């Protein structure tokens, strides 16, 4: 992590650091310590950028405080849950880290997002 941050921290295209994507630890309440530890490394090595991670279980990570540890809670999929979970987060910042494939087809975005599967894929 230290080497990664040192290598890219002067790159203007880096807007935040990501410490993981859909890690199994997100389900375990005690594993917030690991997320906090990785985030602290990022802050120590580059105090100018926030830290996120992609979490694919928004209800679980909000209820067990895993998302509350992050500077920016990154939610993968389930955009219909963003609003309710946003209100529960102390930092009140949410990033849709992986979303397009679940709510669009070939660049066509439909809002508000309805909670149902697509009838067909183009």
PLM features: residue spans?
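Substrate-binding/catalytic cleft of secreted carbohydrate-active enzymes
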Residues: 1-122
């Amino acid at each position: 992590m230290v080497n990664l941050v040192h290598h890219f921290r002067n790159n203007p295209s880096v807007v935040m650091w990501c410490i993981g994507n859909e890690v199994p630890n997100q389900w375990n309440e005690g594993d917030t310590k690991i997320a906090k530890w990785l985030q602290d490394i990022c802050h120590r090595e580059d105090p100018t950028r926030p830290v996120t991670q992609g979490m694919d279980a928004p209800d679980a990570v909000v209820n067990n405080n895993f998302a509350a540890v992050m500077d920016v809670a990154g939610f993968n999929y389930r955009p219909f849950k963003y609003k309710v979970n946003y209100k529960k987060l102390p930092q009140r910042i949410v990033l849709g880290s992986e979303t397009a494939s679940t709510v669009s087809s070939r660049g066509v975005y439909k809002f508000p997002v309805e909670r149902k599967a697509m009838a067909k894929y183009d």
